C-alpha cells in the first residue's frame, strides 16, 4: 500500500542521516554496537560547541521521532507531506553535515566525559 511505502520512506530518511553521521563519528571514536548508539550520536551533536552540529542533531532527533511514529504507531496516518518532509530534512542534514570539519566532530566527541 502507499501508506506502507510512506512509513518505510520516513524510516529510511532517518537511517540515511544516522548512518552518515555514525560513520563520520566512529572513525574518530569507537561507538557502541547496540541500540545506545542512536542516542549517543544525537547527544554528541546536541552538546557540540558548533551550531551546525546542533542543528543536524535536532534534525536527527526529529527524524527519529518521526521514524518511531511511522514504525510503531499504526493508528497514526503517514501522509505524503510527512514522507516528503522527512526526505527533505534528511537531504538537508546530510548536505549540512558534509560541510562540517573533522575537527568540529572531534570537538563534539570531546565535550562529553568518557567513563571507564
Task: Describe each model-derived feature in a short phrase.
Residues 1-116:
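Terminal alpha-helical segments
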